[in-house]
């Protein structure tokens, strides 16, 4: 992310869910999922952000 978008940081919007905001099978209830975005909330970056996460092993 730092190399692709200098000065843009990641935002973690949720990691653990105990309020039932996700689907019944969601890994958020086990603490094995995370919702992230970029600090500028630019939706045009989301596809690449997902690709970077997969390449990093997430």
Curated annotation (Swiss-Prot):
InterPro entries linked to this entry: Hedgehog, Hedgehog_sig/DD-Pept_Zn-bd_sf, Hedgehog_Signaling, Hedgehog_signalling_dom
List of residues binding Ca(2+) 1: 13-14
Cellular compartments per GO CC: extracellular space; plasma membrane
Statement: the UniProt record of this protein carries the keyword Isomerase: no
Keywords assigned by UniProt, alphabetized: Autocatalytic cleavage, Calcium, Cell membrane, Developmental protein, Hydrolase, Lipoprotein, Membrane, Metal-binding, Palmitate, Protease, Secreted, Zinc
Gene Ontology BP terms: cell fate specification; cell-cell signaling; proteolysis; regulation of gene expression; smoothened signaling pathway
Binding residues annotated for Ca(2+) 2, in chain numbering: 14, 17, 19
UniProt keyword Ribonucleoprotein present: no
SUPFAM superfamilies: Hedgehog/DD-peptidase
Subcellular location, principal: membrane
Residues involved in Zn(2+) binding: 28, 35
Single GO MF descriptor: calcium ion binding
Compartments, record wording: Cell membrane; Secreted, Extracellular space
Post-translational modification comment from the UniProt entry: The C-terminal domain displays an autoproteolysis activity and a cholesterol transferase activity. Both activities result in the cleavage of the full-length protein and covalent attachment of a cholesterol moiety to the C-terminal of the newly generated N-terminal fragment (N-product). The N-product is the active species in both local and long-range signaling, whereas the C-product has no signaling activity.
Organism superkingdom: Eukaryota
Similarity section: Belongs to the hedgehog family.
Function field: Intercellular signal essential for a variety of patterning events during development.
Domain notes: The indian hedgehog protein N-product binds calcium and zinc ions; this stabilizes the protein fold and is essential for protein-protein interactions mediated by this domain.
Protein name: Indian hedgehog protein
Gene transcribed to yield this protein: ihh
């Amino acid at each position: 992310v730092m190399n692709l978008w200098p000065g843009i940081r990641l935002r973690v919007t949720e990691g653990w869910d105990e309020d039932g905001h996700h689907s019944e099978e969601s890994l958020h209830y086990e603490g094995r999922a995370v919702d992230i975005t970029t600090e500028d909330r630019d939706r045009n970056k989301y596809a690449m952000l997902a690709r970077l996460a997969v390449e990093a092993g997430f």
